[in-house]
Amino acid sequence: MENFRKVRSEEAPAGDGDEGGSPNSGPFADLAPGAVHMRVKEGSKIRNLLAFATASMAQPATRAIVFSGCGRATTKTVTCAEILKRRLAGLHQVTRLRYRSVREVWQSLPPGPTPGQTPSDPAASLSVLKNVPSLAILLSKDALDPRQLGYQPPNLSPGPSSPPTVSTSKRSLGESAAEEGTAKRSQPEPEAENEDRTA
């Protein structure tokens, strides 16, 4: 493939209607009409996605949001959903994983100038059909059916960014041990007092 370059990549038409273009044909067919769909791409900026998602979920009319991405964008999709769950507590989650067919069109690179070749020779093209993983994450303010596959209830325990409820952090233990050490050092030792008196 070193003599080819990718011209375009497009989603292949689906035969079963599972991945068509309508908004309700995705993995969450029973979504409310006001749900926001965030399509995460490989080149998407996380801060831009989260700014829009946070502003959308702040509106009372928006009850659900779906993050979806395929191929190399799946990790970014998970990152966006996890950050939004940390920012907005109490979100119910359903995760769906599937495969999508993507058609890549490659075109041959023009070879170096050779004698006898005319510049008007058409370049050869190659079409490749690939199955890539696709991930869709639904986050909802409303309770979802806990029996469906991929369901995660809201996280009720404090997250890593929340302060601990009991002050047993390493820092507080270290400080108290250091304070005890300085308190012991500030008291004069009995042997030192005896030496001062004899002198």
UniProtKB/Swiss-Prot annotation:
Keywords: Nucleus, Phosphoprotein, RNA-binding, rRNA processing, tRNA processing. Residues 1-31, 146-199 are annotated as: Disordered. Gene3D superfamilies: Alba-like domain. It is found in: Nucleus, Nucleolus. Residues 1-11 have a biased composition (Basic and acidic residues). GO terms for cellular component: centriolar satellite; multimeric ribonuclease P complex; nucleolus; nucleoplasm; ribonuclease MRP complex. It comes from the Eukaryota. Pfam families: Alba. Transmembrane segments: none annotated. GO terms for molecular function: ribonuclease P activity; ribonuclease P RNA binding. The modification Phosphoserine is found at S172. One of its GO terms (biological process) is tRNA 5'-leader removal. InterPro entries: Alba-like_dom_sf, Alba-like_NAB, DNA/RNA-bd_Alba-like. Residues 190-199 have a biased composition (Acidic residues). Belongs to the histone-like Alba family. Component of ribonuclease P, a ribonucleoprotein complex that generates mature tRNA molecules by cleaving their 5'-ends. Also a component of the MRP ribonuclease complex, which cleaves pre-rRNA sequences. Component of nuclear RNase P and RNase MRP ribonucleoproteins. RNase P consists of a catalytic RNA moiety and 10 different protein chains; POP1, POP4, POP5, POP7, RPP14, RPP21, RPP25, RPP30, RPP38 and RPP40. Within the RNase P complex, POP1, POP7 and RPP25 form the 'finger' subcomplex, POP5, RPP14, RPP40 and homodimeric RPP30 form the 'palm' subcomplex, and RPP21, POP4 and RPP38 form the 'wrist' subcomplex. All subunits of the RNase P complex interact with the catalytic RNA. Several subunits of RNase P are also part of the RNase MRP complex. This is Ribonuclease P protein subunit p25.
